[in-house]
Amino acid sequence: MEKMHSKSVSPVPFNNSNNTSLGGLRKSSSIPTLAVPECESMGNKHIEEERTNNITTMAMKRRLLDPQNKKKQNRFERYSSSNHAQEQSSEENFCRSKKDSTVLKFGIDSILKNKNAEKVPKGISNAGRIQDERFTEACTNTSSNVNPLSKYFKPSSNDQLGARRTATSFSSSSEASDSKSCCTNNNEEARYKYRVIDKRKSADSDWSEDATGNEADDPDDHINQDNCDLASTLEQSRIVALEILKNKRLRLDSSEALNDLTPYDQLSRTEDQQISRRVEMMNHQAFARENNEWPRSFSSGLQDPFAKNLPNAFLPFYMQPYLRAYYNIQKYIYHKKLLNRNDRFYREANVENDNYKTEESLRSPSETKQYSPDASTFYPIRTEDSNGSRNLKVDVEEGDKEANKLFKDLCVSVGDRLSNALSYGRKDYNGLSTSQTSGNRFLNFSDKGIQAGSYYQTGERNDSLAGPLKNSGMSFDFPPKFGSNNSSTDKPEQEDNNPQTIGSEYQINTQRSMKDNLLTAKLLENEAKLRYGNIVTQYPRPFSWPFAASVRKSYDPALRSYFSRFNNSDAPHYGAAQVNPTAGNNFKSMLPGNFENPYFFNELNTLDTTGFLSRQYGHMSSSQNPHSETQNRSEEVRGTVKKRRKWNRAVFSLMQRRGLEKSFQSQKYVAKPERRKLADALSLTDAQVKIWFQNRRMKWRQEIKMKNRGLVPVHILGQDHEIEKEKTQTPSDEGEVINVD
């Protein structure tokens, strides 16, 4: 065996005074580290450079270590910590390049789990740096939650630099069988080197400074021995991740959702756990960058952030819940893979037999290949068109039963909610179906069979949104072409040729178009309520929602088309379809009578000059002749008919009127908080309740004046007749028209 170089300094392992000679990897005498013998192969040049750096460090300490200036202390500590980390990194790289030793990591949990010093793992030797009794006491003292090794590394009171450092783990290096890689100290053979890991060199450490400049206590200074069982910890983390997904408590808006699945936030970490957590956080940061590309509101265009080859994979807006469920599954699968990778890393690092010396385990953690998400990590989304149906295809790993089951449960739960909305107005609703062949899971959502054709035709694919979209049987394109007028504007020119034929076709197309509009409104209402809660009830019109501005910039043509119909002045701003205004007064009779939330569809019933449905179908009446209707519309388009001024009116159902009347009898004036509660209870807006109470108070004052004069109001004389009439009316046909302007 060769001897150590004669110029090397023999360090004292537990002397923490300021005058301790430097040796091995120690950067400063104040750093409470265990000395490391230097390999002879490092050469004199490496030793001289190390001594020069040590002299510089000592000079900086004497110059900056002023008890009255804590900022300089902190600055020196940061400098020394970073320099110390660089020294360790250069030492490891040098030894690895010379193949003198191999770094094998052993967590402190593998040491402390042994009750006796004789049962120390094979890779750890107690013949070198630590006295036998101290090491035995450290290994046997496992009852306390405080690190039993910390008292041997506690610096003196004069040691300002290392006052808050704690020894958390060791690293051992095995000596190769070749005699050239042998190291000695004090003429004794030493096969392993030890060093204390400085926790603050970690990029993810939680050190901070308070207002006085003192550094806060590190929460990970003490190791909880109850959490050393990594296998059970990983299993618990996996169960928690599943529960988070099943209970739908996983947030999707930012990288904070990933913190809910971080398995080591609540654990006191050993060195191996710190290294793995550092790798894990890097993976989470990379995943968060992908997460930022995911649309966080329904105003965003639906893009697949994982499939790099489909940057513009737009999907119908009513399939967004399925995509959210898919996103949950992707996050679960990603975290599960990350846990499996970390579990494999720990298993390779803690095996106590000779079989663990594989190519993977012989690498240091810094050389271990990091698990980072890329396009191949996640299962891509693909859309397929078959016979007019839009199907969503998702690839799932074959044999991953948990992911498949979770995927199916989430999709079915979302499908149940959507089926209630989409089944309105269509009899042959296909709903949700799943199938799996050769590891591919198909989520089939068919929009074929909607009256007046499919919303999304087979010609509308990922990169063809700007192309012409033709829907047979509809009076206008849905969604419309960008920057083009609606196809329904060409109908008046055709009416002069054959008004009888064109009139009947136009009436059929009009009825279909109205059903399509109502179906669209129903879908958007459910989607908005699902995302924004009761915010829809506070705003009477969709374009007055707070997120309407972002919707106008959306890439989803369906949302653009929908919002353009409620506000014609904004239509040119975001490329919506232009329509010719008309007038009318009998749109209400054409609406179905089974609306669950009439407040939302009041805007469709409104005879407003800016309303799409009232402008195009306002003059239509069920009792009118379609020929005369066509003629009136043609004359109006030519400008021969003067437009009438129409008021924005609201129609209240019988239940709403009774609820308002009951509240008015108990209280004539309603405060704003109570008015909002009443509006929410009756599915009305705050403005509608306010205007109703104003009109009702006006009638109430007139009744009082007439009673004072000895007169009986006219509506009281016919009150019994009106009550009988209300009993025979249906909720969709009755209503009180009130001026809300």
Curated annotation (Swiss-Prot):
It is found in: Nucleus. Expressed in the tissues of endodermal origin. Coiled coil: none annotated. Keywords: Developmental protein, DNA-binding, Homeobox, Nucleus. InterPro entries: H2.0_Homeobox_TF (IPR052497), HD (IPR001356), HD_metazoa (IPR020479), Homeobox_CS (IPR017970), Homeodomain-like_sf (IPR009057). Residues 1-30, 61-96, 146-183, 203-226, 357-383, 476-501, 616-642, 722-741 are annotated as: Disordered. One of its GO terms (molecular function) is sequence-specific DNA binding. Residues 79-92, 363-375, 616-629 have a biased composition (Polar residues). Residues 63-78, 630-639 have a biased composition (Basic and acidic residues). It comes from the Eukaryota. PANTHER family: H2.0-LIKE HOMEOBOX PROTEIN. Its main location: nucleus. Residues 7-19, 169-181 have a biased composition (Low complexity). The gene is AHOX1. Residues 645-704 bind DNA. Belongs to the H2.0 homeobox family. This is Homeobox protein AHox1. GO terms for cellular component: nucleus.
